[in-house]
Amino acid sequence: MRITLADIAKKAGVSTAAVSQVLNNHAHAKALRPETRAKILQAVIESGYSRNEAAAEIRTGLSKTIALLLEFSHSAVRGAAANEILLGLLNATAQHGYNVRICNLSNLELVQQELVKYNIRYAACFAFSPLLQEEIGNFCKARDIALCYIEDSCRNDFPLVYSDDQAATREIVRKLFAEGHRRIAVVKPEDDIRYSVERCNGVAAGLQEFGLKLNPLWISAHHDPVEHFADLESWFHLPEEERPTAFICFDDNRAAQVLITALRFGIRIPDSCRIFGFGNTLARQLYYPVGTVVQAFEKMGEAVLDILTGKTENKTAPARYLFPSEIKDAQPKPDSETTSGKTCGI
């Protein structure tokens, strides 16, 4: 039999109004004596009462449900980084009493129907298709739904949360330049996703600080990571004074590919070749020292709730909330040939 507020009130010996005030954290509940509130909460526990959130939302017109719109077909949404971001979001919603409704963007029309049907006022979009991003933005804007994009967005009229990747890659270039590296190669996906563009812009900006340009011949861009091996082998076949001495990879998997290829060619790591990945998803597990960028994935997910509910103003650019990253540097050994007093790649 379903437990009602009246049942709890009878068990606790108080009015139904008092029970409602305590369960809803109403301001009037503070006027109740501590022992009365404790008695009500104990009655709730003993009765096994479960609040009907859907009914409460209909009655009050206030929805505490966040729609999590996911492009499941994209590999990045199923990756390790995405898992940490979503974990942060789920932890935040659980702590603040919000429900989460998972929506698969493979059927956009059905998702839109559900947003209307359940009167959802908050939505977080984790998608990489510009078409999906645009359609979702238009729909939420027309219905006054608070929307936050995660990691990528083609729009500037809704907030985006991610890390400051351009600043991170620029700092890596500075580190490599200080060690004497001049021939710096980039290993990246062949796409125009925002974070790929930002990371590439960061490398270019870092080189520009020292009067250098990103050499297009030292960019390996492929959708399939396996296709990088051909580029890497051609570079490592070059004479030592001509080949790249440092690699900035846009994820740790690609950094591992550079490491594997370099070791096959008998190149000492990190003495003769410096490698940086991104994301800290794999570099920490590698036996050989490979640098990486540690991103605050869980904090990004937690921030989504605050952004949607208007509890934060910590944005670094219009509608962009970018978290600083930590560069985890696998420093060369003391006996390394690549030291601050010797220039590599000249």
Feature map (PLM): residue ranges:
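N-terminal helix-turn-helix DNA-binding module of bacterial transcription factors
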Residues: 1-62, 340-345
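Hinge/beta->alpha junction and helix N-cap segments in small-molecule ligand-binding domains
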Residues: 72-84, 102-110, 161-171, 187-233, ...
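Residue-level detector of anion-binding/catalytic polar loops
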Residues: 15, 50, 94-99, 146, ...
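Flexible loop/turn connectors
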Residues: 229-346
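Alpha-helical structural signal in soluble globular domains
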Residues: 43, 88-92, 139, 198-210, ...
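Alpha-helical recognition/docking segments in bacterial nutrient-uptake
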Residues: 61-174, 234-241, 253, 312
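Short beta-strand segments enriched in small/hydrophobic residues
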Residues: 18-20, 58-76, 183-190
